[in-house]
Amino acid sequence: MTNYNGLIVITGPSGVGKGTLVKKLLLENPEIWLSISATTRTPREGEINGKDYFFLNKKEFIDLVDKEGFLEWAEFAGNFYGTPRAQAQEKISVGKKVLLEIELDGARQVRKTFPEGFQIFIAPPSFEELEKRIRTRGTDSELAIQSRLNRAKEELLAKNEFDAIVINDQLDIALLEIKKLIKS
């Protein structure tokens, strides 16, 4: 059993299966609340404010940054993205588990702003397997694949910064391990 204050962070390199694990975890554990990110990007067709993202203008976003209103935030491709602190703290205060699926830099920020959270690093069984997974997606150019692989090398070096490491070799076993780690 793990002792933490309701905040669960899941991170790991691209292609490791974070998204699939999180979807299965949420399906089997509806009491866990997946944090909704804020962004300054324009909503895509069908996206709903407050469900898919909290859509803010840049001034609103920067005001929240200045007021320490985010557990973590970053700028990507000219837009800001962040995890609002108030919504996570509100859910935790009523006993809910809050899950963040974020990148390494975001996880490091959360460690500073919410050190009592529990952080899990999802790792591949090997770097070769990770490369195979990324390549078989068939969605990226060779340049994008190389970029993802270079970033993955850096991220894998950081795995010991986390409270737990789960190797995603077999999805069901990795999922079971995550459930054991966050059981309270």
UniProtKB/Swiss-Prot annotation:
<dbReference type="InterPro" id="IPR020590">
    <property type="entry name" value="Guanylate_kinase_CS"/>
</dbReference>
<dbReference type="InterPro" id="IPR008145">
    <property type="entry name" value="GK/Ca_channel_bsu"/>
</dbReference>
<keyword id="KW-0547">Nucleotide-binding</keyword>
<keyword id="KW-0963">Cytoplasm</keyword>
<keyword id="KW-0067">ATP-binding</keyword>
<keyword id="KW-0808">Transferase</keyword>
<dbReference type="InterPro" id="IPR017665">
    <property type="entry name" value="Guanylate_kinase"/>
</dbReference>
<dbReference type="GO" id="GO:0004385">
    <property type="term" value="F:guanylate kinase activity"/>
</dbReference>
<keyword id="KW-0418">Kinase</keyword>
<feature type="binding site">
    <location>
        <begin position="12"/>
        <end position="19"/>
    </location>
    <ligand>
        <name>ATP</name>
    </ligand>
</feature>
<feature type="domain" description="Guanylate kinase-like">
    <location>
        <begin position="5"/>
        <end position="183"/>
    </location>
</feature>
<dbReference type="GO" id="GO:0005524">
    <property type="term" value="F:ATP binding"/>
</dbReference>
<dbReference type="Pfam" id="PF00625">
    <property type="entry name" value="Guanylate_kin"/>
</dbReference>
<dbReference type="InterPro" id="IPR027417">
    <property type="entry name" value="P-loop_NTPase"/>
</dbReference>
<comment type="similarity">
    <text>Belongs to the guanylate kinase family.</text>
</comment>
<dbReference type="InterPro" id="IPR008144">
    <property type="entry name" value="Guanylate_kin-like_dom"/>
</dbReference>
<protein>
    <recommendedName>
        <fullName>Guanylate kinase</fullName>
        <ecNumber>2.7.4.8</ecNumber>
    </recommendedName>
</protein>
<dbReference type="GO" id="GO:0005829">
    <property type="term" value="C:cytosol"/>
</dbReference>
<comment type="function">
    <text>Essential for recycling GMP and indirectly, cGMP.</text>
</comment>
